[in-house]
Amino acid sequence: ASVLLDGDWRSGALNIGCNPTFLADRRPTRFETYILDFEGSLYGKDILVFIESHIRQEVTFHSAADLVRRMGIDSEEARSRFIEVHAVDRDLYRRLAAAFF
């Protein structure tokens, strides 16, 4: 995912699902975005999340540690895809940022 925050593009890993590892009763679908290399508060901030590509299906992990390990792999894949699409379509992302902020 590409995340527009304060006029700057950041790479993100987006999960669309029901968190089956922790919520076995399959609650409603949630959209959660992990913004890579971001520290700070998002309270009061406007952000836009652009879905770029699909990495994998949602699965139930045996433990939180297994999930965290896989999130690391997925985050690196998301970072690589972010770098690739922004290198190819730099002008498109510049225009999108200008249109929204």
Predicted regions and their residues:
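Phosphate/ribose-recognition catalytic cores of enzymes acting on nucleotide-derived substrates
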Residues: 2-101
